[in-house]
């Protein structure tokens, strides 16, 4: 297997596109997990792509949430990617991975969608350890304009920013943004949080993907007020879908986040049908915030333990 990093992420993405272009994780999303205590390795097969994860218990978010319920002592199987609706291929890849593991130690399979969970249950006895919301997906045009009755409160915030601040505000994108100035804002934003340690992994990810921002692979949008950065968004366009990796604002400026989000989507992603704001990091407050924007649908995924 090859360990995933920035040198081979494009190779993995190309293969994902060939197998299932509607797959809701990009190679960069898989790579981002390495900053949260989960190093992903992958292998190409005729039937698809298999994944193993090596868990760092000191940094892994899921272990932090589940504690003793999730303490893997060997590699964890992550849901393979196959052609859509191919349960036999999916289960064959799972079988091959289980055979590589020690059945005297706990065997976990993570990241199963509801359909994939049923496939696995048809062949194996499993215990569901955890359910998570991994993808909050929105109609791009809807959250770009904040249209409709359900988003009236968000639109009110946007209109407030436009009325109170827009004349002294500015949007800059990509290379127009001074990354050193941006990082200073980011560090200040983190240090002002209730728990700055919760964002150290995300900060490390931001620093690692700077080259992708600089070469235009990732899209950067920064919001300035009186020439000072008060918010930014890092996003990615793939297969008619926008993925938002990082998004933060100084929300003491009412409506700043709505203004940033609207402009980021309008500038970079107006042709992407869906916007994926990714997972809720196991945080009730993040989940509440993402739900308040009325997603079109949410993808639930499951971690299971195989009963040998």
Swiss-Prot record:
Pfam families: LPG_synthase_C. InterPro entries: Acyl_CoA_acyltransferase, LPG_synthase_C, UCP018688. PANTHER family: DUF2156 DOMAIN-CONTAINING PROTEIN, PHOSPHATIDYLGLYCEROL LYSYLTRANSFERASE C-TERMINAL DOMAIN-CONTAINING PROTEIN. This is Uncharacterized protein MYCGA3080. It comes from Mycoplasmoides gallisepticum (strain R(low / passage 15 / clone 2)).
